[in-house]
UniProtKB/Swiss-Prot annotation:
GO terms for molecular function: phosphatidylglycerol lysyltransferase activity. Belongs to the LPG synthase family. Its EC number is 2.3.2.3. GO terms for cellular component: plasma membrane. The keyword RNA-binding does not apply. The keyword Cytoplasm does not apply. It catalyses: L-lysyl-tRNA(Lys) + a 1,2-diacyl-sn-glycero-3-phospho-(1'-sn-glycerol) = a 1,2-diacyl-sn-glycero-3-phospho-1'-(3'-O-L-lysyl)-sn-glycerol + tRNA(Lys). This is Phosphatidylglycerol lysyltransferase. Residues 1-8, 74-89, 150-161, 222-229, 293-337, 391-394, 437-450, 511-840 are cytoplasmic.
């Protein structure tokens, strides 16, 4: 049997044992708890002195400082260049995390390796020392177990109840001398032979400190037993929790304590309350302190230190590849810690709704209570809704949280005023102020699906809150009180109203205040860039007057865009120096992220797809643009006799064509205005991706006109210079609708011939929307659906007719795409683009 098979068998046996033990613990614990009167437990809790609780929580938080001695020993043994204060802070955070999700201490060992590897040259020795610390966590318990084996502590009652623990006790006791001998014979560092002994002493003191915390919990709930009997129960319970491999020993530890105190005649209700207080004081309080420390300890300074550390080695294999993300993970720890704290705060104060309801039922002034209850619940829900925003470092989410904290403080002050809770709210408020100053964005993008999800989640939470309050009142036999006049009558709807008012006010203030933040470069900068680097088929639309511009720092490239509904809709590809496009887009995305906007690109080519992909985008094919090769275009030949017939017909009717160069006279503009108004027929002009009839815009390029015998303008088209590849395009094409003549054909033919004479080689006839989209069954569903629209909705919008019309000029079809964030909705993105196009 090779080593690999042995390891697999050992792993299977270990998992099987842990699972079987867990099932046994759950079943036994359920049987023990089923007979407990929870109402009596709540009554016992109400009798506890609040100052005793404060002392308990302080003691629970302070007890974990002892574990920091591990890291002090480690840093001194390896001669790390790290201050004692930093060691204590980092160690406290690691140990608090390890206590909750320790898995036998392996989580803590992994975090230690990640943090301290940047402070030492000898990584191998660091791993050896951390392994020694990991094992020594058991040796302290082993030392205490020896005291039971030699009958210093009497554990006969509990050992008779749980016989299998006796064997665990003997094995663990025997482990101590082996560890001490091994650590002294083969130490990680020959100059530190007694490190194993030091760590064992730290471990022993730490277990005793935990025992003192639990004993104090027993004193608080009036569960008096002798300390010698108690310590024996605690040691066996700790061993059971350690063997179970369950984080924190949850279940196994509690079961042994419950059975042990039961044998000593302590009521189960008191034991349960004692365990709950212990879990809160020894686990929850240190985690809260660790989260607060994390919000200060692991910030931008830590990230900069790691990036500049001479010990930081680039990733070369799988392990180092994962570790290469550590600086990003560490940078997110403060916001993650604060988000968790806000989440816990929300949950705790949701539970405190019950206190307000309980007091209100016995008070004649129901109105005041039910308004305060609605405010309290609204604030708790707002805290919960903004947890993700706080993690994402959104200033708007932090402001929501700060307002919620203030509202909860007011409600707390006027109802169940508690100095502990108000102090806690003050701490969270200060942390939110610090987070607000560090925040890297004003707000997150507002998306329809997020709004719907938020509404559904809010309704669910409010419903659960109602069920919790009603169920608790029923369990406490309070439902006999008449409820029709109580605070619960209009509570739900008032809560929704308060939430809507707060969200509406803050959202409006942010949009109003920061709508002025949007920056726009000067059009002169864009003109200079186009003159130097060239343009594209859309570059002339910088003169349309409905766009803003974003340039890079060196002003060698720019984008033209427009804001709509928390999105920046960009028209076409970037313009300018292609080498600057990466820098330009990165700056633009940073700008959009800071303001909380989505970025959407409309009508881009396939030339820069890799660039857009690098920014986490996906694509949707909008259609194809018809580009005519003027070097191959001609009206001669059998296939072109239709073109010649059209031109001959206009000649017979004495309809002429000419190109008018700017500046234009007022009379000429008025003639064009007359044709444009009749052609529009009171329809609204489109914007953004096309030009509009505007004298300033039209005066930027020549205009082709067709005149009748009376020299009156009957049709016109505006030119769009592209400033690249000898190409030209047309924008507005309008004619008198009452004339039964192929005026659009006439304009196109004359423009094509004129452009060819002027030396242009390409002519852009515009896009055929949804053309050649989703034609294969391998295409995305959204594109296949768009393709069906192209085929079957020709009566609603002439998709096919437009392509057929342009196809007779034998163009080359070039695809055009919509580019949008991968976590955004296609239909929402298309909707925003259409709103930009159809509204000025």
């Amino acid at each position: 049997m090779n080593q690999e098979v042995k390891n697999k068998i050992f792993s299977i046996l270990k998992i099987t044992f842990a699972t079987a033990l867990f099932i046994f613990v759950v079943i036994t614990l359920y049987r023990e708890l089923s007979g407990i009167n929870f109402k009596d437990t709540l009554v016992e809790f109400s009798k506890i002195n609040r100052m005793s609780l404060v002392l308990l929580f302080i003691g629970g938080g302070a007890s974990l400082v002892i574990l920091s001695m591990y890291d002090v020993i480690l840093s001194r043994a390896l001669k790390m260049d790290i201050s004692l204060g930093k060691v204590l802070r980092v160690s406290y955070i690691i140990n608090a995390l390890n206590a909750i999700v320790g898995f036998g201490g392996f989580i803590g060992a992994g975090v230690r390796a990640m943090v301290y590897k940047n402070y030492t040259h000898d990584k191998k020795k660091l791993v050896h020392f951390i392994s020694l610390i990991l094992i020594s966590m058991l040796t302290g318990l082993s030392l205490l177990s020896l005291l039971i084996v030699f009958h210093v502590f009497d554990a006969s009652l509990i050992l008779d109840k749980i016989t299998w623990v006796r064997w665990v006790l003997y094995v663990v006791s025997f482990f101590l001398p082996l560890f001490i001998i091994y650590s002294m014979v083969r130490p990680p560092d020959k100059n530190n032979r007694f490190v194993g002994l030091y760590c064992t002493l730290v471990s022993c003191v730490e277990w005793l400190a935990a025992a003192v915390v639990l004993y104090f919990c027993g004193v608080i709930v009036d569960a008096h037993v002798s300390f010698m009997s108690f310590i024996a129960i605690f040691i066996i319970a700790a061993l059971s929790g350690l063997v179970s491999f369950i984080p924190g020993g949850f279940g196994a530890f509690d079961l042994v304590v419950l059975l042990g105190f039961k044998t000593l005649g302590v009521p189960e209700e008191k034991v349960l309350l004692m365990l709950l207080l212990y879990r809160f004081a020894y686990y929850f309080v240190p985690v809260i302190i660790a989260l607060i420390l994390s919000s200060f300890e692991f910030g931008t300074s830590a990230k900069k230190y790691i990036e500049g550390s001479k010990y930081f080695i680039p990733a070369k294999d799988v392990t180092s590849f994962l570790m290469s993300y550590q600086k990003d993970i560490i940078a997110k720890i403060p916001s993650l810690s604060l988000a968790i704290l806000v989440f816990f705060t929300s949950m705790i104060f949701f539970v405190n709704n019950l206190t307000i309801v309980y007091d209100a039922l016995y008070d004649g002034n129901h109105l005041t209570y039910y308004i305060l209850l609605a405010i309290h619940t609204s604030a708790c829900l707002l805290l919960l809704l903004n947890v993700v925003g706080i993690y994402k470092q959104s200033r708007r989410a932090i402001i929501f949280a700060m307002i919620s904290i203030l509202l909860i403080t007011v409600a707390t002050f006027f109802t169940y005023a508690s100095y502990i809770l108000i102090t806690w709210l003050a701490i969270i408020f200060v942390l939110l102020i610090v987070a607000f100053r560090r925040a890297r964005r004003l707000k997150r993008p507002v998306r329809m699906r997020n709004i719907v999800a938020m509404l559904l989640f809010s309704l669910f939470i409010l419903y659960v809150n109602h069920i919790f309050i009603a169920g608790t009142l029923y369990a406490l036999d309070i439902y006999t009180i008449e409820m029709h006049t109580s605070v619960l009558r209009y509570y739900f709807w008032l809560t929704i109203l308060i939430i809507a008012i707060i969200i509406g006010m803050i959202a409006w203030l942010f949009d109003y205040q920061f709508s002025k933040v949007r920056i726009s470069s000067k059009i002169e900068d864009c003109e200079e860039i186009i003159n130097q680097y060239g343009g594209n088929y859309l570059s002339h639309l910088i003169y349309s007057g409905d766009k803003q511009f974003f340039t890079n720092e060196n002003k060698t490239a720019f984008l033209m865009y427009r804001y709509k509904a928390s999105s920046l809709v960009v028209l076409g590809d970037p313009l300018g120096d292609e080498n600057a496009f990466d820098e330009l887009l990165e700056a633009f995305y940073n700008y959009a992220e800071y303001l909380g906007y989505d970025v959407i690109f409309y009508q881009v080519t396939d030339q820069h797809m890799p660039l857009y992909h690098n920014f986490g985008n996906q694509f949707f094919k909008l259609g194809e643009e018809a580009i005519i090769d003027l070097t191959q275009f001609s009206t001669s030949g059998k296939k072109r006799r239709g073109f010649r017939a059209t031109l001959n017909k206009f000649d017979e009717l004495n309809i002429s064509f000419e190109i008018i160069e700017p500046p234009f006279s007022t009379e000429f503009i008025n003639e064009l205005q007359h044709v444009s108004d009749l052609w529009l027929d009171n329809r609204q002009e489109m914007h953004f991706s096309v030009g509009q009839f505007n004298e300033e815009y039209l005066s930027k390029a020549p205009i082709g006109v067709m005149r009748n015998e009376e020299n009156e303008v009957i049709a016109f088209c505006s030119l769009m210079p592209t400033y690249f590849n000898d190409a030209i395009s047309v924008d507005l094409i309008r004619w008198l609708p009452e004339l039964d003549l192929p005026l659009m054909d006439g304009l196109y033919l004359h423009m094509l011939l004129w452009s060819k004479e002027q030396g242009y080689t390409k002519f852009n006839m515009g896009m055929a929307t949804l053309s050649n989209v989703g034609q294969l069954h391998y295409s995305y569903l959204r594109e296949r659906l768009a393709g069906r629209v192209f085929e079957h909705f020709n009566g609603l919008y002439r998709f096919q007719g437009l392509r057929r019309y342009k196809s007779k000029y034998n163009p080359n079809w070039e695809p055009r795409f919509l580019v949008y964030r991968k976590d955004n909705s296609l239909w929402e993105s298309l909707s925003k683009v259409m709103r930009v196009i159809r509204h000025k």
